Amino acid sequence: MKNQTMKSHTMKNRLTPSHQIDLGSGDGRIVREAALRLYQATGVELNWPLVLYSRLTCSRLNCIHRPKFLRTDLLRHSLSTYDVVVIFGVKSLMKPLQAKLAAELHPDACVVACRYRLPDWRHVDQIIEGVDSVWLYRPPAAAAAAARTGGAARAWS
């Protein structure tokens, strides 16, 4: 798990988000790291003890943008205001989640998927190492436009 977190951070170092969400935030380590880097960060998790643990752990941080942890269904939470979406989901969730991402994300947004790929999206970058694999995506409409113009996304450097 620690190896997965490090790979996700490596991928995110290629991004310059202003507002990040971690879907399936678990113990909150990705959200904490984002908050320490001065990003606005939100974690969404169904497991109430993990939400409480994350809130307690982050309450000790001295961050400009205090991280938020929400106990809610990630398929019901609006993603329209986020620049970067981090997903540590289960395989069966990836297909319904990609439809939600396509419908709600703005064109400059980025998606970092950990462990499981989005089945119908084309990744723009990847770190492949077995179960610790990470993929970087852009919403399909934005990726198609960039391919036509040869442009790069504004959301990463």
Which residues make up each language-model segment?
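Conserved class I S-adenosyl-L-methionine
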Residues: H19-G26
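Conserved short alpha-helix immediately C-terminal to the canonical SAM/SAH-binding motif I
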Residues: W48-L50
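Conserved SAM-binding motif I beta-strand of class I
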Residues: Q40-E45
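Conserved SAM-binding loop of SAM-dependent methyltransferases across substrates and taxa
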Residues: D27-Y39
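S-adenosyl-L-methionine
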Residues: M1, R14-P17, L52-S80
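A short SAM/SAH-binding and catalytic strip from SAM-dependent methyltransferases
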Residues: S80-P96
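C-terminal substrate-binding/active-site "lid" region of AdoMet-derived donor-dependent transferases
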Residues: S92-S157
